[in-house]
Amino acid sequence: FTLMNQDSEMIDLASFKGKKVILEWTNHDCPFVKRHYDTDNMQELQREYTDNDVVWLSIISSAEGKQGYVTKSEAKELTTSRNAQPSHVLFDSNGDVGRLYDAKTTPHMYVIDEKGLLRYQGAIDNLGVTGALFSTDLSKAKNYVRNAMNSLFLGEEVAEKNTRPYGC
């Protein structure tokens, strides 16, 4: 896919072949997304992986006039105010890429390896299945994205390839 970023540049996923890529479907109005940003959880993951040459693409699939929609300048402000560090914020306002990836919620996470193969898709963590869905204590959460990335960095198979996403 190719989408426009916050700087009006067209970003092509295929151009990142040879690098690990994390896709994060996001919606700044979603309380589950807010939880991960308000606790600095998402930003810590972004820093950890972008500092290790991983491409992090935050994708907004909200159409103008719909909940979660932001302009390019609002996306830049959100990135700055939250101290977020995605490689790019991408706009999918017609939802085509979201449908292509079957992105159902925000956050909905995807991990792609250097060959361009999807290695993980689903929830960011296990709070959606532990009964702690609304908890703000993420310290005991099993982070599926971190586990998938650790496996890739070790050259191992990702144990949990699919989990049920939760969110908005």
Question: What annotation goes with each model-predicted range?
Answer:
Residues F1-V21:
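A short beta-strand-turn-helix
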Residues D113-C168:
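Thiol-/selenol-based redox modules, centered on thioredoxin-like
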Residues K34-R82, S93-L100:
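Structural microenvironment flanking redox-active thiols in thiol-disulfide oxidoreductases
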Residues L23-E24, V55-I60, H88-F91, V111:
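Structural recognition of the beta-strand scaffold that forms the well-ordered cores
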Residues N27-D38, E64, M109, G167-C168:
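Short, thiol/selenol-centered motifs that function as redox-active sites or metal-ligating centers
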Residues K76-D113, L118-R119:
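Short, internal strand/loop/helix patches
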Residues A14-K34, M149:
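Short active-site neighborhood of thiol/selenol oxidoreductases, capturing the structured segment around
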